[in-house]
Amino acid sequence: MIQPQTRLKVADNTGAKEIMCIRVLGGSKRKFGNIGDVIVASVKSATPGGVVKKGEVVKAVIVRTKRGVRRADGSYIKFDENAAVVIKDDKQPRGTRIFGPIARELREKDKEFNKILSLAPEVL
């Protein structure tokens, strides 16, 4: 569950290291986001020479959460960290590489995230 003020690690090579959620997109009363949801975030720390700079407001898709997600067979998949991938307005990733595993639920949420899934080293 990602809500405003939650800090997430960035799982791509855009240059951002950590972002902070400003808003979960998808309705005015939306309080929490889970895997596959798009958020608006502020870059809190970044590497020099990256695509994004510190203080920049970006859109990102959540790819890993500590809370995890329940699957249809009753099992849960949880991760060690909250992580997101910085995306453009057309839902394509801004970076060229993705780090760490990505949950399969991302494919079921939106077909436009297939590029992120194809770049990921592992899909769980």
Swiss-Prot record:
Keywords: Ribonucleoprotein, Ribosomal protein, RNA-binding, rRNA-binding
GO CC, any one term: cytosolic large ribosomal subunit
The UniProt record lists the keyword Ribosomal protein: yes
Gene Ontology biological-process annotations: translation
Coiled-coil intervals: none
Entry annotated with the keyword Membrane: no
SUPFAM superfamilies tied to this protein: Ribosomal protein L14
InterPro entries on file: Ribosomal_uL14, Ribosomal_uL14_bac-type, Ribosomal_uL14_CS, Ribosomal_uL14_sf
Gene Ontology molecular function: large ribosomal subunit rRNA binding; structural constituent of ribosome
Source species, domain of life: Bacteria
HAMAP family found in the cross-reference section: Ribosomal_uL14 (MF_01367)
Function: Binds to 23S rRNA. Forms part of two intersubunit bridges in the 70S ribosome.
Description of how the protein assembles with itself and partners: Part of the 50S ribosomal subunit. Forms a cluster with proteins L3 and L19. In the 70S ribosome, L14 and L19 interact and together make contacts with the 16S rRNA in bridges B5 and B8.
Family: Belongs to the universal ribosomal protein uL14 family.
Protein name, per record: Large ribosomal subunit protein uL14
Organism: Clostridium novyi (strain NT)
